[in-house]
């Protein structure tokens, strides 16, 4: 594990550059905010206000559930999850020595996929549990961990070559602000990859504690390609694409599992054909290629 370069970081409270204090914490230049290290991880969550409810929820969620083992014992789900990850890896640029940000890193699967290729990666989550697991799973001088909120990213602008947010956007309160936050940290010429369930019919149950309707899996939003692209500023829509994948019929008929031996590229062709002929994709991907020159902006649409 490597310590994140301080030059990459900003205070999530006042946007100032950070420095290491005599106490061994990260501190804003005016000394008004300090941020601790927990088990070697920088915790750059805002200090000026109490943590929002969603932050507390997902911190507790990470402590209770190990999503690295979520599909253990379910070979169909394991195969589906593997194909999702292959789809993301296939969308990465072919360049060498990329600097990537994994937003909501979970078990650290992306680290296992990209570090052997010589890339650098920041595994980021709102809890300390998941980045710590990711670093333990894939220790490397090119692997960094961070505890932070994607809505208040503590990075200097235009830092990353690639930002991946897989199965995250359906959970956030303000998807447009979420996308704008990610785009602001993406280099010109960089690539943003977002995946989410396709046109999900969100189901609710009655919470036994508050007696209010609560969405299953904490999914707050459902997206189609058009809805996902609408989150982008108009200037970036021409350089973005959104498409469905992971055909439902192939999953339910067990063909996805029976053909699990197929190479990733061959499977993607079969899946694309099934979605073209029969429809019913289960997942959605948006790829945004940020222009190398303006005029463009990364703010959320009004």
Regions found by a protein language model. Give the residues of each.
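Residues lining the SAM
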Residues: 166-169, 195
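Active-site micro-motifs of SAM-dependent methyltransferase domains
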Residues: 152, 170, 230
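Conserved N-terminal segment of class I S-adenosyl-L-methionine
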Residues: 1-156, 162-166, 176-179, 218, ...
